[in-house]
């Protein structure tokens, strides 16, 4: 009887763990900004502490459908663009990405030259189609 209870308990725990993993949104950190990305998708930019810092920085870019589930969009690109101000040249700081275990969630790195207001310009092309968007972000 004791073995039966232990076996059933282990099966229940395994089933619960599988159910939680398959339907949950990805753990991406604290979202800095999100917005529509075309093709009924939402893109979210997040960092571990919710702050985008200048210099070498790491972040997560995730694409989700209307139900909040991650969607693989294929190749992604992001550039942090700060327009020309006075004698200062415009800055375009590109990011590099690696995929994660979760399709639609990408780990990014960038070297952002200066703190201030920038535009995050995002493009993608792949299984979900082609799309682009941009939104303002504050770099600290």
Cite the ranges covered by each PLM segment.
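Sec-dependent bacterial lipoprotein signal peptides
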Residues: 1-19
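Intrinsically disordered, low-complexity terminal tails/loops enriched in metal-binding residues
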Residues: 19-140
């Amino acid at each position: 009887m004791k073995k039966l209870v232990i076996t059933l308990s282990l099966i229940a725990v395994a089933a619960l763990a599988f159910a939680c993993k398959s339907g949950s949104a990805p753990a991406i950190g604290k979202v800095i900004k999100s917005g529509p990305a075309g093709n009924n998708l939402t893109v979210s930019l997040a960092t571990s502490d919710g702050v985008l810092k200048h210099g070498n920085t790491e972040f997560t870019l995730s694409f989700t459908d209307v139900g909040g589930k991650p969607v693989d969009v294929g190749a992604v690109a992001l550039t942090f663009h700060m327009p020309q101000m006075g004698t200062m040249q415009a800055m375009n700081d590109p990011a590099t990405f690696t995929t994660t275990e979760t399709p639609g969630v990408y780990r990014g790195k960038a070297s952002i030259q200066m703190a201030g207001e920038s535009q995050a310009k995002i493009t993608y092309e792949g299984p979900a189609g082609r799309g682009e968007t941009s939104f303002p972000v504050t770099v600290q």
